[in-house]
Every structure is written in structure tokens, then in C-alpha cells.
């Protein structure tokens, strides 16, 4: 873009204009670019592995954000350079998020990657209370105390093309600032200069040595209490209160390693469609979620329910036998079909009449430690609605709550001992162009005050076996704790 085009866009009324440059980056990786450009508070790295086995084409590296929104309950704080510049008590924090995003009138420049910045971060599980007032405030203690919503204004991002070995660096420029075009171009050149510098070496992760033992964890439940909670849910199901509930346990350990080393280990042990590393300054969120919560791209709304789990086998033959066993398990199939129906209902709430389709039904996807049954539901976003409307309709996922959803969440409030926080919420972005991509916050660690917390659960139906449900939660956290052990082992050397 030249200066004349920049000024033309400013005259039209855009208050943010993307400036971009493209460069070969075949000697770099998304991780090395993050460490060179963005390894500071309020930054992020987003990567993807499709179907558990193939790296996605694009990775996104968010440079440190100067403006951040933090929401606790109904109180909203906007911080700029770490200083609170706005403070609001609001009736609907989700409406505030949308109105805040609308302050940014960003020009859509042809040829740029489909994601070139936006509001990036998470919406916690308890954001459902902004929509479903019947649930009230969380009745459970909140030992983590992290925000219910945390979003960074991502106005400088690098999009790495893993296939072509090149990258786009994109910065948003406010045309009202003095010498805005020249300052934006200078910032891009500064980023390129930084990329040319060698990276400070980090200690390698030793994958050939003896495998570190998984750390012992402290649970929010005893095993007996968790199995009793499963039994109580089965009583509710038999009484006709609900068809399924998804309880969870939080597992916590002391953690002294560098959070980025945990991400490095996790992307090795458990590559998934949604991999993320967030440095929020006072805490980190590190995850490898297999499951989209809701995606809106060019007005197509997509959810992808995952339900039905088996551990991975030691051989291909064992994997196939486990797949056959999973697909012939009446309990797992019934649970999955229930969640397909819930997904259709959720997508239908914001889609044009007759547009909702089941585009994939009960396929198996394999991950490092487990395999899942997966389906795909899509619909055309109804005219007049936005990506935020889709989030309102679908958060939290049925796979993290149950069916019917509201009654299941009331039972979760009754039986779980702590507020869920990030777990079970949405991690991802609202792009400037109106698109949205969010993952369910599962297989996710919150690192806070020298402790690491990971939460896992499972869907309970009428014929669930309490002992097996406990074991399922242990299997689901195994990749994370294996990564924790390697990160700790590396830091101790």
C-alpha cells in the first residue's frame, strides 16, 4: 500500500488501516518468531494440527498488545500500557465486548491473510450467566481468581505460512496520528530487522532420555467424592431431570518451569486443531484443544461435537480394534447422538431456516493419548446476526455441560466444588472482518502464582460406570501432565 491509498482509506472513515509486508521465513518457525518478536505480557501464539495428524497451514503470532479488556463478573476494565483507562459496571458484558470491537473501523485489504488481528483471548465458562440469568452468579469458590473474560486488542500480528515458508507481518495504524503512514512502515521494518537477529538458544527438550514420571496432583475431588457425584447425576437422570451431565475435576500441581517450555512439550506430545499459548502477564493459559466451540467464517456457523473416547493403542492394529469397540459402544453412541442433536439446536438458533446440515457424522479422530468420535454441524448465519450472537447461542458447548443444557449446568453448580473459570469456556478470536474462531477450553492449563491447574471431565448418562468415569478424566489430562513432566525436567537441568 502506498501513502496515497492510505490517505484515501482514512478519508473514507476508517480509523485503523492495516499495513503489511511479506517476507520469506524458511529459516524460522512460528515458535522462533514468537520468541523473537512477542515474548512479553499480553502476547499469544496460535497454531493448528488438522485431524490430530497434519499441521495446519497458518500460525498466528500476536505481538504484545497495549490495550487489554478484563472482565470480572459485571465489571469491565480497559487497560492501556498497564494503566486502567476505562472502568464500567455493565448489565451485559458480551454486549460491551461487541460495542468495544465496533469502535475499531478497520479497512479490509485484499490479499491479506483471513486473520489479520482482532480481539484475542478467552471467554470463561461462567459467561453463560450473562445470557442465562436463571443460573445466577456462581455459587462456588473461585481460588484462581482469573478474569471471566480477557481480550487483547491485537493490532500487530505475524501470520506464518507453514506450507510456503513465508510470513505476513501486519500492523494496524491509526491515521489520526502524526506521520501515521511513515510510523507504520517504520514499525514493519523494525519487525523485519528483529527477525534477522539470532534467537537466544533455549534448552532442548530431551525426548530420548528416560521419560519423566507424571507429577502427583491435588484434585478438587477425592476419587470417592467424584464417583459419588457421578452416582448423584445418574439419580437425576433416572428421575427425568436431564439426559446427560458433564462434571469435571480440577487437578493442580506446583509448577516452576517456563510456561513456553510447557507449550513446546505439549505441541510435541499432543498436537491438536487448536493449540494456544497466552502470556497475560500475571498468568498464562496454555492448551491443545481438539474441539471447536463455534466458528463463523463468511457467515457460515460451524460446531464440531466430540463425544466418545478411547485411549490410543500401542499399534495400528490395536488402534483399529479400539475404534471398532468405540463405534459399537451403545453408551458412547447414544451420548454422541444426543450431542449432535444439541449442536443442531444450538446452530439452528442463529441460522437461516433450513440451512443447518450435518456435514460429517461419527468419524474417528486420533490424538496422542486418546481417540474421539467427531461430527460436524454447519448452518448459514441468519441475516442481522453477528458472530457474538453465535457465541451467545452456543457457549458453553453441550460436550462440557450436558442436556438439557440449563438444567445440566444447575447440577454442575451443585456438585462441582470450585468455579470453572477458563475451563469449558471459549479460547480464540473475533477478527476485525467479523469472522470468529473459538475452541473449547479443554486440555488447557492455567498457570498462576507458581501453580498449574488443568481440568477434565466426561459425559454422564444413565448407564455410566462411576469408576470408569474417574479413569476417563485421568486419561484426558495425561498428555498435559506428560508435557509438564518434560518441561520441569528440562528446566531442572
Swiss-Prot record:
Free-text remark on how the cofactor is bound: Binds 1 Mg(2+) ion per subunit.
InterPro entries tied to this protein: ADC_synthase (IPR005801), Anth_synth_I-like (IPR019999), Anth_synth_I_N (IPR006805), Anth_synth_I_PabB (IPR005256), Chorismate_C (IPR015890)
Subunit (UniProt): Heterotetramer consisting of two non-identical subunits: a beta subunit (TrpG) and a large alpha subunit (TrpE).
Catalytic reactions on record: chorismate + L-glutamine = anthranilate + pyruvate + L-glutamate + H(+)
Binding site residues for Mg(2+): 335, 472
Regulation: Feedback inhibited by tryptophan.
Residues the record lists as binding L-tryptophan: 48, 273-275
Positions bound to chorismate: 308-309, 423, 443, 457-459
Protein name: Anthranilate synthase component 1
Pfam families: Anth_synt_I_N, Chorismate_bind
Enzyme superclass (EC): lyase
EC code(s) of this entry: 4.1.3.27
Protein species of origin: Pseudomonas putida (Arthrobacter siderocapsulatus)
